[in-house]
From Swiss-Prot:
Catalysed reactions, as listed in the record: (1S,2R)-1-C-(indol-3-yl)glycerol 3-phosphate + L-serine = D-glyceraldehyde 3-phosphate + L-tryptophan + H2O
Enzyme class: lyase
Name assigned to this protein: Tryptophan synthase alpha chain
Record-level GO cellular component terms: cytosol
SUPFAM superfamilies the UniProt entry points to: Ribulose-phoshate binding barrel (SSF51366)
Similarity field: Belongs to the TrpA family.
Keyword set, alphabetical order: Amino-acid biosynthesis, Aromatic amino acid biosynthesis, Lyase, Tryptophan biosynthesis
Species lineage: Bacteria, Bacillati, Actinomycetota, Actinomycetes, Micromonosporales
Known pathway: Amino-acid biosynthesis; L-tryptophan biosynthesis; L-tryptophan from chorismate: step 5/5
Disulfide bonds: none
Gene that produces this protein: trpA
Length: 267
């Protein structure tokens, strides 16, 4: 079983959901992002999702875009991302990477898979890659023992959903809201329906992303999903802070609140 699968199994045995916290690599700096992700782990985040900053992040909301722009302006490269992954993986939590496909193609698909595995990464979430066009990635992830997470949405047809899920390993990423990511005031009513559709075709855990920003929302999502994925709300802790130390304090507090939320699922 994959490292991330173990995290989901452990959470299930404890009657709770997994908390996945996302942060772009190199935001606010390379060392700053390592400090931020380490703080999240110390506050109770179960899995870290490291996003590779990209200049045209079509599915990311304004908060993640702004953080990615800061990282890119600082000159962050894929090699830096791998160093960050290695540092965070050393804490013992699973580290999954989210990336648009272009940076992987530019790096070389097999070389990227090899280097990601060597850094201790567990796998990839690929928002703009569909299994039908992923032959090279399917082969590379098999060769290097990496998980692969494709996205399903409320708009996915049954055929598309089944085919997508069939090619996932580790967990399935269910996007709870249509459109770009970002903290919302309420969880999408479509999310529980989507999760039950996914569970109808696979035993893989289902993580729900897009919109969670408070402990209460995390508790709600934990009531119907195996994983609660949070990005924008955590990133905003750093964006809105006057300094990195102040940002890390806010980040720890929100991470702890979210961690408490996933441990008290609302049924």
């Amino acid at each position: 079983m994959s490292h991330i699968g173990v995290a989901f199994d452990k959470a299930r045995a404890e009657g709770r959901a997994v908390l996945v916290g996302c942060m772009p690599a190199g935001f606010p700096t390379v060392e700053g992002s390592i400090a931020a992700m380490t703080a999240m782990v110390e506050a109770g985040v179960d899995v870290i999702e490291v996003e590779i900053p990209y200049s045209d992040p079509v599915m990311d909301g304004p908060v993640i875009q702004r953080a990615s722009d800061i990282a890119l302006a600082g000159g962050v490269r894929v090699a830096d991302t791998l160093r960050i992954i290695e540092a965070v993986a050393a804490t013992g939590v699973p580290v999954v990477t989210m990336t648009y496909w272009n940076p992987v193609e530019q790096y070389g698909v097999d070389a990227f898979a090899r280097d990601l595995a060597a850094a201790g990464g567990t796998g990839l979430i690929t928002p703009d890659l569909i299994p039908d066009e992923a032959q090279e990635w399917l082969a590379a992830s098999d060769a290097h023992g990496l998980d692969r997470t494709f996205l399903v949405a409320p708009s996915s047809t049954d055929t598309r959903l089944e085919m997508t899920v069939e090619h996932c390993r580790g967990f399935v990423y269910a996007t709870a809201l249509m459109g770009v990511t970002g903290a919302r005031t309420q969880a999408s009513a479509a999310a529980p329906v989507l999760v039950s559709r996914v569970r109808g075709v696979t035993d893989l855990p289902v993580g729900v992303g897009l919109g969670t920003g408070t402990g209460a929302q995390a508790s709600t999502v934990a009531g119907f999903a195996d994983g609660v994925i949070v990005g924008s709300a955590l990133i905003r802790c750093l964006l809105d802070a006057p300094s990195l130390p102040a940002g890390l304090t806010a980040l720890r507090a929100l991470s702890a609140e979210l961690a408490a939320g996933v441990r008290t699922p609302a049924h």
